[in-house]
Each structure stands twice: as structure tokens, then as C-alpha cells.
Amino acid sequence: MTNIRKTHPLMKIVNNAFIDLPAPSNISSWWNFGSLLGICLMLQILTGLFLAMHYTSDTATAFSSVTHICRDVNYGWIIRYMHANGASMFFICLFMHVGRGLYYGSYMFLETWNIGVILLFATMATAFMGYVLPWGQMSFWGATVITNLLSAIPYIGTNLVEWIWGGFSVDKATLTRFFAFHFILPFIITALAMVHLLFLHETGSNNPTGISSDVDKIPFHPYYTIKDVLGALLLILVLMLLVLFTPDLLGDPDNYTPANPLNTPPHIKPEWYFLFAYAILRSIPNKLGGVLALVLSILILILMPLLHLSKQRSMMFRPISQCLFWILVADLLTLTWIGGQPVEHPYIIIGQLASIMYFLLILILMPTASTIENNLLKW
């Protein structure tokens, strides 16, 4: 008799995705981040659901309701901090996952990659709207500054901003709709993640060498299930260390002051995971130019398959490209640091140089390095 997991219509889908899935025998821990992102997403939906049970999306009571969750709700403080720091863990895993894709040429799976970029945008939108909900100073001013960027769009900009606000400023209507979108988007992300996985399983996983591994496959279970469990334990360990010891390490103290439209904080800045893009935005003196650079800094990922000129898929055997990749990582860390600094000398010029370097590396230097490496192969 055939095993039920191979015949039952629902079990069969799970079986083909997580149990009998043929996986390359040599994928490293860099391939763990997909499952970790799944865990982060489930954790965020669960903690978010319990927070939504006690939260009120009204400007008069939003801040108080978050305080109420932390003080009066049973274990409300841990749910709140798991949700806030869970977002940070989510983005750490996201950046690692995207970095892995860039390094090992995973972007050559076009559908999987493009849906991944859409997922990145959706997650960033969700995180931004979630940051507005506690209605602290940084929530309010962050929402004001970021939504205002749309006013740079010629002709329709101002109308578009007021349409998103639901009035002439960030107010009650804005908070309510942000809460609605923040609630629905994670479910859209879940659906997209399933499509992401569906397309991945059409081709099978890439591996560190970038060479076809069809001749050497092993079943996903038990080999990679146990490996994913280890990754999950480490993820939860780091998350709980953050939550239980330094819950406000990655937050902004300004957000413990209730939103006040009459008082601007000295330094308006987003959460740490947006700082690199924020630095690119600020490094261009023109408003529309800055907005375009901001969008392009993420949208540039769509171009990666077109910019791939190498005869080899992975960077494993390409030392020049490897060197440029790690310079890009250092550049992004520099941008993240600059994004959190005030707009003054020397931070302005460092930010501008790092922004130029970012686009230069991806659009010109890395494709050039690929061509050089191709020619070196002939020697």
C-alpha cells in the first residue's frame, strides 16, 4: 500500500515541497534563510494577531493602547517586543537571503527572483506601516516625511499624497488605513511566498558551485529539515536575547513620546533596516532625484539577470567579483551608518560617495569584472 503522504491530495503537496523534495547535497547554511523567513513570517502574523486584539487605531488612543498592552495585558510586553524585534530579525534574514542570491547567481531563476523582489517591496511597505501604528513622535514624523516623498511626482504628486493621507495631513484617517493595510499585507506576503516556492520547485535549488546538481540529489527530509531546525533554534535564541535583555536596542527613544504635530524631533530617521535607502535618498539634493534613487536602490535587483555577463553562474570561482561583492556589502553598511547620522559635514559627502559607489559597483564594476574573468578563463 502506498504511503498516505504520497496519495492524499493535500499531504502530497506538503510531501513534494518539504519531505521527498530532491535537494542538492552541497547547499550550505546560506540556504537556511528561506525557511527562517517562513518562521519569521509566521511569528510576525501570530504576535501581530494578538497585538491587534488589544490595539486601537485611533489617534487619541493608539499610543495609550500600546502602553496598555505592555503594562496590563498578560505577557503583552513580550508579545509587543517579539513583534518589534521580530521585524528586525525578518530583515536580517531578508538581507542575508538576497545577498546569497546575488553571490551564488540565484537570480538566474527569473520568476523566483522577480517574485522575491516583489516580496521585498511588500515586506518593506508592511514594516513601514507597522512603525506608524504606535503613534509616537518617530511614527508620526516618519509617516509624514516618507508619504510626502510622493509629492515629488510631477503633476499628480500633491493629490496623491492627500489621497493617501485621507486629508491634509497625517491624521486619524491615515492611521486607520495604515492599520488595515498592515494587517492584510502579511497574508498577501504569505501567498506570494507560496508562489515564490512554487517557482523555485519548478527548477530545483541552486547550489554554491552554480553547476547543475541533477546528478547528485538527496531527499529534503531528514537532511535539510534537521539543518533548518538548527537554524530556527539559533534565530529564536538571538531574537529572545534581544527581546529579554535589550528590547529597545534597535528602536528609537523618540517613539516613547506621543505624536505631536507641533514639535519636530531633531533627527527624523526610519528603523535601521531602511537606513541604507534613506541615506541614498538624502544624498541627492533634488527631491524627485532622491525619490528615484531611493526606488532604484531596491528596483536595481530586477536588473541583476541582465547585468550577469559571466560564463559562470556562481561567484565561487570568481575572485575579482567576490572582492567587489564584499566591497558592496561594506558600502551598504556604510550607507546604513550614514542614514542614522545628522545631515552635516562630513556625513553628507560620505553618504554621497557611498551612494555613487553603490550604483557604480552594481551597474558598471561587477559586469566589467565578469568580462575580465571570462577573458582570464581563456589563458
Curated annotation (Swiss-Prot):
Subcellular localization(s) per the UniProt record: Mitochondrion inner membrane
Organism superkingdom: Eukaryota
Residues that bind heme b b566: H97, H196
Gene Ontology CC terms, in alphabetical order: mitochondrial inner membrane; respiratory chain complex III
Cofactor(s) this protein requires: heme b
Principal place of residence: mitochondrion
Cofactor remark from the record: Binds 2 heme b groups non-covalently.
Transmembrane segments: 33-53, 77-98, 113-133, 178-198, 226-246, 288-308, 320-340, 347-367
Note, other: Heme 1 (or BL or b562) is low-potential and absorbs at about 562 nm, and heme 2 (or BH or b566) is high-potential and absorbs at about 566 nm.
Family to which the UniProt record says this protein belongs: Belongs to the cytochrome b family.
Protein name: Cytochrome b
